[in-house]
Amino acid sequence: MTEQRPLTIALVAGETSGDILGAGLIRALKERVPNARFVGVAGPRMQAEGCEAWYEMEELAVMGIVEVLGRLRRLLHIRADLTKRFGELKPDVFVGIDAPDFNITLEGNLKKQGVKTIHYVSPSVWAWRQKRVFKIGRATDLVLAFLPFEKAFYDKYNVPCRFIGHTMADAMPLDPDKNGARDVLGIPYDAHCLALLPGSRGAEVEMLSADFLKTAQLLRQTYPDLEIVVPLVNAKRREQFERIKAEVAPDLAVHLLDGMGREAMVASDAALLASGTAALECMLAKCPMVVGYRMKPFTFWLAKRLVKTEYVSLPNLLAGRELVKELLQEECEPQKLAAALLPLLANGKTSHAMHDTFRELHQQIRCNADEQAAQAVLELAQ
C-alpha cells in the first residue's frame, strides 16, 4: 500500500509584501494541516515558515521597465522552468501571490495542465486595463480579494472571487493608542500634529514635497504649536526630502522619521499624503487626511483616459463617496491643501465624523484574511 502524499501547495511571491502574505497563509494552513508541503518562489519569511524555495524571491523582485528588460531572459527562463516542474509535481493548488505580470501567465500554463490555481491579491483591474479580467478568468480558478468592491467587479464578469478582508486591517487595532504613539515620537499630548507623507517613490517625493512643506508653513500661521512629522521610507528618500526642504522651507521645524509611518499617522490629528496604500493605512490609523497628488502632465492626461474609477484613494473607493478630499494635479497646491486640512486640525465635527466612518470601514475589511485565504485554498484542494 502506497503512503498518501501530503497536501502540496505551490506558491510564488515576487516581493516583500507577497512574502509577508505567503508566510501568513502558510502559517494558517499548517495549523489545519501540519504535514502540508510548500514549494515555490519564496522570500525569507515564507522560508522561515517551512516553504521550500526553488528560487529566491529576489529573482523576481525587479522594478521599472529598464530593469525588467535587462532581466527578461532570466524571468522567462524561471517561468518556463516553474511551469515544467510544477506541471510534473502536480500540486493540489498553486497560489500566485500578487506579481500579476509574472503569475497570471504561470497560472494559465498550470491550469491547462490540470493544476488548480488561485491568484492572491487582485491587480487593480477595476481601475484600469479592465480587459485583463478575461485573462485572469481564464488563468485562475479563484481570485482572493482584499476589498469588497473588487469582488463586486469580478462578479460582474462571472470570475470566481472571494473577499477575504485585508491583512493590514487585521494587524491594526480598531482603536489606536494616540497618546502611546505620541510618547514614542516625543510629541506633546496637547499639541496639534500634522503628518506629511509625500510618497515612497523618488518621483512622488520630487513632485510633492515642496507643496507639502509650503502647506505646512501656511498651517503653522494658524497653529503656532503645530508639530510636523515626516516619515520617510529609506535613507535615499530622506536625503531627497532634506534637499528639497533646504531649498523651500529651511526654517520650518519638522521631525524627520526613518520609517515609522504608522506611528506618525496614529499620533497625528491630520495627514497630508500621496495616494496609494498609505491612504488605507492612514484610514486604519483613524487619522483624518487629505490626499494630494501630482504627476507629469502627459502621465496625468493618460491616466484620466485609462482610469475608470471616480476616486483615486482607497478610503473613498471603500466608502463609495468623497470621504476624504482628493486634490489632484493643479488642485494640489498649498492654499487649497491648507484650506482642506484646517478643519481637520481643528479636531471638531468634521474630523470626528471622518474618524467614525474610518472605524466602520475598518470593521468591514477586518475578516482574518490569513484564515480566510487558508480556508479557500483547502476548499479548492478537495
Curated annotation (Swiss-Prot):
* A family per Pfam: LpxB
**Molecular functions per Gene Ontology:** lipid-A-disaccharide synthase activity; phospholipid binding
Pathways involved = Glycolipid biosynthesis; lipid IV(A) biosynthesis; lipid IV(A) from (3R)-3-hydroxytetradecanoyl-[acyl-carrier-protein] and UDP-N-acetyl-alpha-D-glucosamine: step 5/6
Entry's InterPro entries?
Glyco_trans_19
**Superkingdom, according to UniProt?**
Bacteria
Gene Ontology cellular component terms for the protein in this record: membrane
Q: What is its EC number?
A: 2.4.1.182
Is the Nucleotidyltransferase keyword given for this protein? no
- What does UniProt give as the signal peptide span? none
The keyword Glycosyltransferase belongs to this UniProt entry's keyword annotation:
yes
Its UniProt entry gives the catalysed reaction(s) as:
2-N,3-O-bis[(3R)-3-hydroxytetradecanoyl]-alpha-D-glucosaminyl 1-phosphate + UDP-2-N,3-O-bis[(3R)-3-hydroxytetradecanoyl]-alpha-D-glucosamine = lipid A disaccharide (E. coli) + UDP + H(+); a lipid X + a UDP-2-N,3-O-bis[(3R)-3-hydroxyacyl]-alpha-D-glucosamine = a lipid A disaccharide + UDP + H(+)
Give me any GO biological process, just one: lipid A biosynthetic process
Q: What are the alphabetically sorted keywords of the record? A: Glycosyltransferase, Lipid A biosynthesis, Lipid biosynthesis, Lipid metabolism, Transferase
**Function in brief:** Condensation of UDP-2,3-diacylglucosamine and 2,3-diacylglucosamine-1-phosphate to form lipid A disaccharide, a precursor of lipid A, a phosphorylated glycolipid that anchors the lipopolysaccharide to the outer membrane of the cell.
* Protein family according to the UniProt entry: Belongs to the LpxB family.
Q: What is this protein called?
A: Lipid-A-disaccharide synthase
